[in-house]
Amino acid sequence: MNVVLKFVRFYGYRGLRIVKGSMQYVWDDSGRKYLDCHAGHGAAFLGHSNPAIVEAVVRQARELVAASSSFSTPSLEEALTEFSRIAPPWAEEIVFLNTGTEAVEAALKAAWLATGKRGIVALKNSFHGRTLASLSVTWNPRYRRGVPVLDTRFLSPSTDPGEVEKLVPEDTAAIIVEPIQGEGGLTKIYAELAKALREAADRVGALLIFDEIQTGFGRTGRVWAHESLGVEPDIMTAGKSIAGGLPASAVLSREGVLATLASGRHGSTHAANPLSMAAVAAASRFLREEGVPDKARAAGALLEGLLRDRIEGLRLVRGVRGEGLMLGVELRLDPGPVLRCLQESERVLALRSGATVVRLLPPYSISREDAEMVVYGLERCICGGSGC
């Protein structure tokens, strides 16, 4: 007798079967419509089934799906051209991969090879992935438990910039930082700390890595969130939305850094595959031609303003955090019941960040009506019958 294998879920099941999506909305198998502020952990920032991405992927699927990066393909060439138009000006080299954690692994490996050192510095409350090296620079002890992770020195995001120099050892190969901590309660790194980390990296000959997997590609209202810090890294990771929701990631570096991974020092079967590259090219073009970062900044300002007006003063709310369309509401209680209420009663999908923050990662296309739906739904779900 054939038995369907049991699917092991990495994340807690939300009790919802999603069958269709269109831009900022998804539908379940009963036809109910939801505003999606979860967006596949932020991957659907350009919208579910964005026609520009769908058209490019369907066209490519009819021509060529699989090819090793030992060969050149038109879709890879197009992806390089389009992504280069939105890349930060300091970047000179790029590799395409499949997932965010893969990008972090490659970034750290390149740093080790380029510097000849082994030490790593990261920030407390960071999240960079769940494979071995990326897990080693992820703070959450629950994720790390039982796994022989690499030694990492963790600094507080509130570290005094004047203290950074003596906290970064001489044997450091890489300092890795998220401009805004996706799982760390949406804590923003401040410019003074970023500058101190840049100076410390230069002093010891380490490479500074900015992890822009969640913050990048327009979500914060800039193409890359680190643009607001006045600091340039040596390496940057990108992922989630760079292929319009399909699996793709990238690592960018200064000249000579990623080159250490060439000629068999690194590899990935599906890296730079034609289908994903067609999606990266289409997504990059759409981001630029449609002015997506500017639209995200405007939509984020609207949503943040409504949250501050209606939500921030509630008795059970500590504050509103984030930037652009990467926003969070810090609560004085477990966000789990609030997330369930949003889904079941308000038809808004969201997720948590850290222990007490409701995280909102909607597509760039949300409207004022959508923003009001989120805010009034949050107000009802936070207050319940308490009259707060």
UniProtKB/Swiss-Prot annotation:
Residues annotated as signal peptide: none
GO molecular function, one term: transaminase activity
GO cellular component terms attached to this protein's record: cytoplasm
Subcellular location: Cytoplasm
PROSITE patterns attached to this UniProt entry: AA_TRANSFER_CLASS_3
Gene Ontology BP terms: arginine biosynthetic process via ornithine; L-arginine biosynthetic process; lysine biosynthetic process via aminoadipic acid
Assigned keywords, A-Z: Amino-acid biosynthesis, Aminotransferase, Arginine biosynthesis, Cytoplasm, Lysine biosynthesis, Pyridoxal phosphate, Transferase
Modified residues (N6-(pyridoxal phosphate)lysine): K240
Catalyses which reaction(s): [amino-group carrier protein]-C-terminal-gamma-(L-lysyl)-L-glutamate + 2-oxoglutarate = [amino-group carrier protein]-C-terminal-N-(1-carboxy-5-oxopentan-1-yl)-L-glutamine + L-glutamate; [amino-group carrier protein]-C-terminal-gamma-(L-ornithyl)-L-glutamate + 2-oxoglutarate = [amino-group carrier protein]-C-terminal-gamma-(L-glutamyl-5-semialdehyde)-L-glutamate + L-glutamate
Cofactor: pyridoxal 5'-phosphate
InterPro entries assigned: Aminotrans_3, Aminotrans_3_PPA_site, Class-III_PLP-dep_AT, LysJ, PyrdxlP-dep_Trfase, PyrdxlP-dep_Trfase_major, PyrdxlP-dep_Trfase_small
Cofactor comment: Binds 1 pyridoxal phosphate per subunit.
Annotated positions binding pyridoxal 5'-phosphate: G100, T101, F127, D211, E212, I213, Q214, T269
Keyword Magnesium attached: no
Residues that bind substrate: R130, S268
Pfam hit, one: Aminotran_3
Entry EC no(s): 2.6.1.118, 2.6.1.124
Pathways per UniProt: Amino-acid biosynthesis; L-lysine biosynthesis via AAA pathway; L-lysine from L-alpha-aminoadipate (Thermus route): step 4/5; Amino-acid biosynthesis; L-arginine biosynthesis
Family affiliation: Belongs to the class-III pyridoxal-phosphate-dependent aminotransferase family. LysJ subfamily.
Subunit architecture: Homodimer.
Protein task: Involved in both the arginine and lysine biosynthetic pathways.
The protein's name in its UniProt record: Putative [LysW]-aminoadipate semialdehyde/glutamate semialdehyde transaminase
Native source species: Aeropyrum pernix (strain ATCC 700893 / DSM 11879 / JCM 9820 / NBRC 100138 / K1)
Lineage: Archaea, Thermoproteota, Thermoprotei, Desulfurococcales, Desulfurococcaceae
